[in-house]
């Protein structure tokens, strides 16, 4: 009954996957299976860590992946701030194929992560130097032994993760572009951009096309493949910018931490049919609200592919 209400409750977690992830993530630090099984109440939203031996206060930034689709559409220009944020790569109108547009997106993503990692290092350093949590650090294994607070990487299984949100909005938008502009040719770039610039007001017919394009969460192979490809490319490019703040291998955790609300006013209308100002999609691999229409089993199958 609760699931059917569509409220996003209760939360479903695959604990076998969480244990396996901890074993891989902390393998170089000698984690045991028993330790990996001592998962606490979830760190943050859907993050995982080791109870009494891990910390989750240091972040590598919170990128808005849906915004990167905007940068790809407008060649590094931000319609919200009216500033050229990233170097020009290639105008969307000059991309003869979806693959050309996708390649441009990845290049903008590379610029974004380069800037973000520098900013997050500065923020983490400031937190460590100015507001270290000494009391809590004393309660975590490893801090006293190493003489380091949790902000400095003292816990035995410390981690500094990139909270990656709005990935489903980005994937749905990319598929809508592929479907409507390149595959079926129902729209041109000029038509789509006019509708987006107007926040779909007066272009409700185009919004209907965008909203009706196949979406993540319905067990549609092509959509699921693109969603998975996008997430893997995000991780690959993020990790290419070096280790995390503590010097360990960089990792991501896709979830929202409510940033899907914060990002809403600064993210324009998107090709997935969403209007500017409307909250982006919550959680990690949940469907865009109102678009998972093939039942809960289809949603779970799509989520497992992402």
Where are these regions (language model features)?
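Conserved catalytic cores of very large enzyme subunits
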Residues: 1-306
């Amino acid at each position: 009954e609760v699931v059917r209400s569509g409220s996003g409750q209760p939360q479903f977690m695959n604990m076998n996957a969480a244990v396996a992830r901890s074993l891989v993530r902390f393998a170089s630090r000698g984690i045991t299976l028993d330790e990996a099984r001592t998962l606490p109440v979830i760190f943050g939203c859907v993050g995982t860590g080791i109870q009494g031996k891990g910390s989750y206060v240091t972040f590598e930034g919170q990128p808005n992946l849906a915004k990167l689709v905007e940068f790809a559409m407008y060649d590094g220009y931000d319609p919200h701030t009216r500033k050229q944020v990233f170097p020009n790569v290639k105008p969307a109108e000059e991309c003869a194929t979806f693959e050309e547009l996708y390649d441009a997106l990845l290049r903008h993503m590379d610029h974004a992560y380069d800037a973000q990692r520098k900013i997050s290092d500065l923020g983490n350093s400031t937190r460590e130097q100015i507001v270290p949590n000494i009391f809590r650090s004393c309660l975590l294994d490893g801090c006293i032994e190493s003489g380091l607070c949790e902000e400095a990487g003292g816990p035995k299984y410390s981690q500094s993760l990139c909270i990656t949100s709005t990935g489903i909005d980005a994937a749905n938008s990319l598929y809508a572009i592929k479907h409507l502009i390149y595959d079926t040719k129902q729209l041109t770039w000029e038509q789509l951009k006019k509708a987006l610039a107007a926040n779909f007001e007066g272009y409700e017919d185009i919004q209907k096309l965008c909203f009706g394009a196949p979406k993540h969460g319905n067990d549609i192979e092509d959509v699921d493949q693109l969603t998975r490809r996008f997430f893997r490319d995000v991780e690959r490019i993020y990790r290419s910018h070096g280790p995390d703040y503590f010097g360990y291998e960089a990792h991501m955790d896709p979830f929202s931490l409510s940033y899907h609300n914060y990002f809403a006013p600064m993210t324009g209308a998107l090709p997935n049919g969403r209007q500017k100002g409307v909250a982006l999609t919550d959680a990690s691999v949940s469907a865009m609200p109102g678009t998972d229409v093939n039942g809960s089993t289809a949603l779970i199958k799509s989520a497992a592919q992402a």
